[in-house]
Amino acid sequence: IVGTWLAASKTIELEEIHRFGNEQKMMDGHLRWDFEALFNELKTGLKKAFAKYGDEIKSIGIDTWGVDYGLLDKEGRLIANPICYRDDRTKGMMDAAFQKLPKEEFFQHAANQFMEINTAFQLISETDLQRAERLLFMPDLFNYFLTGKCYNEFTRASTSQLLNTKTHQWDDVIFEKLNLPKHLMQEIIYPGTMIGELTAELAAEV
């Protein structure tokens, strides 16, 4: 989508540039998002936008659904395609979490609606944590492949059930009680934050 600011009417005009399908696929025993395919579609959209508007494009913003994430290894490579929130690996994980951190206390730290799809419960069942160096939520993952920069954007982080409601930072108690590696999490940034430019390689491609 290309958005054009119309100063006279103080409105934004939206134009669809590229549309594509997106379905979860069963890979390695789990329902996963085909990240490479999605990123290729994103690049196609950028190519179309730049072909039509060129230097008139002043910024790029990424938005996706919440709770799902990708893990990067020490070399900055995506370990595996992100597992979809509809995968059944989280069944029973919420009750398992409440054995370590009672529901009422949990809610005092992260006042989210309790759902098994939330990131906290996905991570309890995650098998790649030992290999992981960074966790990026879906929009953060696209931003990383666009710019090379690693951040966790606040609105997506807020769906994780790992963010303290009052401080808006990662909650030490939740990570400690659930035995989750807090070092995977990145600096929190807010919507509209400028994080960088397209990598030279990607800029040449699009």
What is the predicted function of each stretch?
Residues 47-206:
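Glycine-rich phosphate-binding/catalytic subdomain of phosphoryl-transfer
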Residues 35-42:
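Phosphate/oxyanion-binding active-site loops and adjacent basic polyanion-contact surfaces
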